[in-house]
A protein has these predicted regions:
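A residue-level signal for conserved active-site and pocket-lining positions in enzyme catalytic cores
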Residues: 18, 25, 40, 115, ...
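Stable alpha-helical structural segments in soluble proteins, enriched in small hydrophobic residues
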Residues: 4-8, 43, 61-64, 140-153
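N-terminal beta-alpha supersecondary unit
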Residues: 1-27
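DPxDG-like acidic metal-binding loop motif
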Residues: 19-48
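Surface "functional belts" at beta-alpha junctions
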Residues: 47-139, 154-158, 164, 169, ...
């Protein structure tokens, strides 16, 4: 965090707000990022805004979609377990707008539209990948850009809470087995 602030030439107390990716994504990564953002928000007395990771990727992809006349598209990322996290967007006023989702499903259940993101690169037999976007993933820059744009336009953002689309892989251990005497 300090390195990023140093590179930007600012201090934490100079910030007006923080933006954090809320997922969908891996449980541990989401919890770590959200806990860090919440702690920094408290320490610096600034609000913390949530941004869906798929929205961050859609924001980046939207420029390409607009340039190529793609009115509706899907963003998909790796959800592991042979599934993708995905959402369906449309260009509205030159900006991607969420129509449906986010979802988690096997790739062959995704809406048949051009697909931006690493999910398309993983499942080329099921998804119509947009060339040069088959490895794209959400970025911190994209999260910040979506938050800044929404706040400038007076739009709300999602709560800074994890967006889980399925149950955790972690299991609570059952009772201990006792050895027979």
């Amino acid at each position: 965090v300090q390195t990023v602030l140093d590179q930007a030439g600012v201090t934490g107390i100079a910030l007006d707000a923080l933006a954090v990716g809320v997922g969908p994504g891996p449980f541990t990564g989401l919890r770590a990022g959200l806990a860090t953002a919440a702690a920094l928000g408290l320490a610096w007395d600034v609000p913390v805004h949530g941004v869906r990771s798929l929205d961050a990727l859609a924001h980046a992809a939207g420029v390409d979609a607009f340039r190529h006349g793609i009115e509706e598209f899907v963003v998909a990322t790796d959800a592991r377990r042979r599934e993708v996290y995905w959402a369906h967007y449309a260009q509205v006023g030159g900006q991607p707008t969420l129509l449906h989702g986010p979802f988690v499903s096997p790739a062959d259940e995704v809406t048949p539209l051009p697909v931006y993101g690493a999910g398309a690169g993983l499942y080329p037999e099921a998804l119509r990948a947009v060339p040069d976007w088959e490895t794209a993933t959400p970025s911190a820059v994209g999260v910040g850009q979506v938050a800044e744009l929404a706040l400038r336009r007076g739009r709300g953002l999602v709560p800074a809470e994890p967006l889980y689309l399925r149950e955790s892989d972690a299991k609570v251990p059952g009772p201990r087995k006792r050895a027979g005497a």
